[in-house]
Amino acid sequence: VASGVLYCYIDGAARGNPGPAGIGVILTDQDGAVLREIARYLGETTNNVAEYRALLAALEEALRRGAEEVIIYSDSELLVRQLLGTYRVRSAHLLPLFRRARELMGRFRRVTVRHIGRERNARADRLANRAIDEKLNT
């Protein structure tokens, strides 16, 4: 990554809660050029687990690419507020994912987490849903 900064748009989707789930991740450079898209089927899980799994996939890919700074965009208010410390992680099945995310976040010089509206995250949402559709239609 030339500038050392990666922009990550993440989304998790589940049909039913729990239900068939997938993640969508888009990594771009500072000019908005897409460096990587990830669409991955997760199996049966909850929407919130899918959101965290999308975050972990983005952070792992950013580390692989040698990014020093990561800016995460998510439409999940729960995920963003938990990462910022304004919501406590009460769910036992989210706690290990939260801890892993914090551990990965600590490897970067800086991580910024921003809440965005669904309309600004439509592309990541499409990837997450495509992963589910491709699995269910095979």
Regions found by a protein language model. Name each.
Residues I10-N17, L56-N129, E134-L136:
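RNase H catalytic domain
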Residues V1-V49, L59-E68:
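RNase H-like nuclease fold core
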Residues E51, L55:
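Short, conserved alpha-helix that lines the donor NDP-sugar binding/gating region
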